[in-house]
């Protein structure tokens, strides 16, 4: 809808309609969910910039991040994207929340568990298919995930992230359609595990700010 036209509330019976708020699902693991304060920063940045007709959705309530924000999300600590794809659980969450846009930063635990890159990409494809089954016009923003410090995670983790991220653009191009775009969001470049994480894996405030900025740059053209 047009945020400048308060006289048109839209059809309340059509949550996915063009006049209702844009429903955005943050999807992933603990980097997204616990505490995942990049979501709070992103919400604040979007609303400060005038994008107020938005609704973050998910089955999880978020943690406190120091200021009010729309905290609902699907960031599940410890989750492997390969396990979620196999379980079919995403379909239940989609039915309950009806997102228009998904922000997916997913695969860190898979890399740590030595899942091959192609296996992770196949899981991404399964999730995208489930998303489209619920909303044929779903927009999927897929992160090239933040780096991991092998000294503080697993010996193969740093290279595993590089391998996954190198493969994501080609995968996204093969999955994307005009009706349901799959957009790559680079969360890796410029992210430093030394200064932007507290443990070599999870973002600190500096890392959260970078993640929020990258999502913001990808989201605003979709919301204009």
Give the role of each language-model region.
Residues 105-109, 129-163, 188:
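Active-site segments of SGNH/GDSL-like serine hydrolases
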Residues 27, 196-224:
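Histidine-centered active-site loop/cap adjacent to the catalytic His
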Residues 1-19:
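Ser/Thr-rich, Pro/Gly/Ala-heavy low-complexity intrinsically disordered linkers and tails
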Residues 20-24, 49-55, 97-103, 134-141, ...:
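Loop/turn elements at helix/coil->beta-strand transitions in domains of secreted/extracellular proteins
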Residues 24-25, 31-123, 157, 162, ...:
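Conserved SGNH/GDSL esterase-like catalytic core that processes O-acyl groups on lipids
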Residues 30, 34, 44-49, 93-96, ...:
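Structured segments of extracytoplasmic/periplasmic soluble domains
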Residues 59-82, 177, 184-203:
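Divalent cation-coordinating acidic motifs and surrounding scaffolds
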Residues 147-186, 205-209:
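Substrate-gating cap/lid alpha-helix
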